[in-house]
């Protein structure tokens, strides 16, 4: 059983005030990372026993804030806000920059990618894990929120597997769109090939 408990709930208008979201902080995470739950009530009618749509979103400063074309993180976050605001559910915003290696290390990996290495090879050359994220904390956050069953908005099967291993019932995998551009196509193709992300390209 998780030691995580809810610390504070605060309503914040996002999208220039067009969307109301409840930001939720937690007690009991010894990692020192300030993971946040974001709740959207949903704008369309739903049954009382409906299963919430949930997105585990790992922090990406370059994509989420600056709209980097080297990844699809910003577009995925925007899509998650749109869809979960409509259907009701949670975004768990996890402080796992660079698939868990941190911002500075991610920039070092980008420099290696500019030399022709793929995203996973670059991490390996830096003696870092190709994906250092532990989604057990997301399961603990859901348990603290009283959520035991989810519809998971993701193309990444590892997220679902880790939630299941930590006691969360994943009722459905809901794929995100493929946000491809000239800068990130190779990156996305590598994720599909090496980590079995469910991405379908035109």
Swiss-Prot record:
Recorded hits in InterPro entries, A to Z, give: GTP_cyclohydro_II, RibA, RibA-like_sf
Q: What metabolic or biological pathway is this protein involved in?
A: Cofactor biosynthesis; riboflavin biosynthesis; 5-amino-6-(D-ribitylamino)uracil from GTP: step 1/4
Residue positions annotated to bind GTP are 55-59, 76, 97-99, 119, 154, 159
Keywords annotated in UniProt: GTP-binding, Hydrolase, Metal-binding, Nucleotide-binding, Riboflavin biosynthesis, Zinc
Q: Which cofactor does it need?
A: Zn(2+)
A biological process term (GO) from this entry: riboflavin biosynthetic process
Swiss-Prot/TrEMBL catalytic activity: GTP + 4 H2O = 2,5-diamino-6-hydroxy-4-(5-phosphoribosylamino)-pyrimidine + formate + 2 phosphate + 3 H(+)
The record's EC number reads: 3.5.4.25
GO terms assigned for molecular function: GTP binding; GTP cyclohydrolase II activity; zinc ion binding
Under the cellular component aspect of Gene Ontology, which terms does the record hold?
A: cytosol
Write out the similarity annotation: Belongs to the GTP cyclohydrolase II family.
Which PANTHER family does this chain map to? 3,4-DIHYDROXY-2-BUTANONE 4-PHOSPHATE SYNTHASE, GTP CYCLOHYDROLASE II-RELATED
Q: What does the record give as the function of this protein? A: Catalyzes the conversion of GTP to 2,5-diamino-6-ribosylamino-4(3H)-pyrimidinone 5'-phosphate (DARP), formate and pyrophosphate.
Q: What is this protein called?
A: GTP cyclohydrolase-2
């Amino acid at each position: 059983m998780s030691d995580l408990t809810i610390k504070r709930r605060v309503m914040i208008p996002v999208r220039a005030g067009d969307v109301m979201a409840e930001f939720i902080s937690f007690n009991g995470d010894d990692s020192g990372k300030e993971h946040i739950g974001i709740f959207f009530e949903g704008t369309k009618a739903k049954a009382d026993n409906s299963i919430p749509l949930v997105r585990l979103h790992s922090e990406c400063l370059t994509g989420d804030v600056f709209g980097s074309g080297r990844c699809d993180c910003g577009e995925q976050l925007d899509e998650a806000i749109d869809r979960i605001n409509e259907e009701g559910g949670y975004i768990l915003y996890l402080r796992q920059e660079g698939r868990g290696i941190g911002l500075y290390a991610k920039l070092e990996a980008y420099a290696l990618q500019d030399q022709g290495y793929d995203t996973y090879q670059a991490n390996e050359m830096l003696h870092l894990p190709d994906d250092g994220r532990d989604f057990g904390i997301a399961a603990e956050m859901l348990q603290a929120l009283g959520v035991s069953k989810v519809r998971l908005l993701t193309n990444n099967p590892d997220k679902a597997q880790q939630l299941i291993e930590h006691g969360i019932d994943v009722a459905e995998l809901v794929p995100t769109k493929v946000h491809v551009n000239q800068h990130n196509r190779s990156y996305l193709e590598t994720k599909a090939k090496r980590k079995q992300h469910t991405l379908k390209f035109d």
